[in-house]
Amino acid sequence: MKITFLGTSSGAPTRYRNLSATAVQPERGKPWVLVDCGEATQHQLLRTPLSPLRLEAILITHIHGDHCYGLPGLLASCQLNGRTAPLTLVGPQAVWEYLQAVMQFTEMRIDYPLQFLPVNEKLDVSAGGFQISAAPLSHRTECWGYRLRETQVPLQLNVERLQAEGIAPGPGYAHLQRGEDLQLADGRWLSSADYTQLSRRPRVAVIAGDNDRPELLAGLCEGADLLVHEATYTEDILLQVGPEPQHSSAERVARFAEQQRIPNLILTHFSPRYLSKPRRQGDRLVAEIRAEARRHYSGQLQLAEDLASWLISRDGMLLPL
């Protein structure tokens, strides 16, 4: 399971950070899923091996521009590049209305099947090698977090049970292991589900939109290997800014991840005021976000960088690529 950050800035881009967009890929195959689509996301894709033509679903967390202004351009480019495969768009109803207005007034044409699914707490959609669900968050507008659980986990065959029931090894074993039901020569049907189990635990990543109450993700994060969450500010700046923007600090997200025992945490969506290197005295640094989170979280901690990729290994480790 692979995570690639296409944009990691909040509100406005910087020289080194584009706006929110995160690609998620399964272990095998080229299909993938995109979470949010800030302005110029398609430009960022040109710097990666990811193909927009293999994109199967776009999950928008909320209508704010730094999370969805890149959507019309990406969809239009898919049309120009000859896309014919269906594409699923998930998000608040306002996202669909925004897209429809852009299509109307710019004469944007989309011929490939584009299915919109309004996000809600009952969301259960399969795309890009993942089973996707959602939970509502706390922000100035309707906002959601998404849980992506991998579905392409090989099955393990219960050979002992098959042999105990007198079913000899043969080509039928392979059918059952692929998840296919099997009819025996005597007419009996064997259900693959009765003779197989997952060979390992499916990996799970939770990617949240803007949110000032990390605890709202408790249900979605149950059993998760990775949480990707905004840390727009350090706690001191958040207190100065006040509650109105409804964002989180590194401290608040780190405390939540520690309480939930989430093994891997990647912080993203940093205010442009935080720089990688100081330009003048008094500049705030991204390193402060890391230091604050580390004081409250003992798991594996990373700060997202544009175009950086991370692998969640089969044993749940977060490895740089």
Question: Which residues are covered by each model-predicted region?
Answer:
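Conserved beta-strand hairpin/beta-sheet module of binuclear metal-dependent hydrolase folds
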Residues: 1-48, 84-86, 146-148, 155, ...
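General small-molecule cofactor/ligand-binding pocket signal
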Residues: 4, 90, 115-120, 133-135, ...
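Active-site-proximal loop/helix segment associated with metal-binding centers of metalloenzymes
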Residues: 15-16, 130-207, 211-219, 226-228
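Active-site neighborhood of phospho(di)ester-bond hydrolases with catalytic His/Asp-centered motifs
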Residues: 35-38, 55-64, 92, 205-211, ...
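Active-site metal-binding motif and surrounding structural segment of the metallo-beta-lactamase
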Residues: 39-90, 118-120
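Active-site neighborhood of divalent metal-dependent phosphoester bond hydrolases
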Residues: 83-118
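Binuclear metal-ion centers of metallo-dependent hydrolases, dominated by the metallo-beta-lactamase
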Residues: 121, 213-321
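Short, surface-exposed amphipathic charged segments that create phosphate/polyanion-binding patches used
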Residues: 125-135, 314-321
